[in-house]
């Protein structure tokens, strides 16, 4: 499962979601600006407060990193 922790105003979050959509990859989008529980989960997993944070089957990517995303979705 892929989960993206994002905010509505984050341009890198938008790029991440557009990239996954272009590859026909399903994901869950979580708005951490509104959901405090999810924000705390994101911080616990990534040790970061910036977005996007991408959780691909338990592997955490901070920021939009095509190479890392591709490596993990090809597994």
UniProtKB/Swiss-Prot annotation:
A GO molecular-function descriptor: electron transfer activity
Keywords for the protein's UniProt record, in alphabetical order: Disulfide bond, Electron transport, Redox-active center, Transport
Keyword Electron transport annotated: yes
Pfam families: Glutaredoxin (PF00462)
GO biological process terms held by the UniProt record: cell redox homeostasis
Gene3D superfamilies: Glutaredoxin
Keyword Disulfide bond: yes
Disulfide bonds: 10-13
Domain named Glutaredoxin: residues: 1-75
Family: Belongs to the glutaredoxin family.
Name of the featured protein: Uncharacterized glutaredoxin-like 8.6 kDa protein in rubredoxin operon
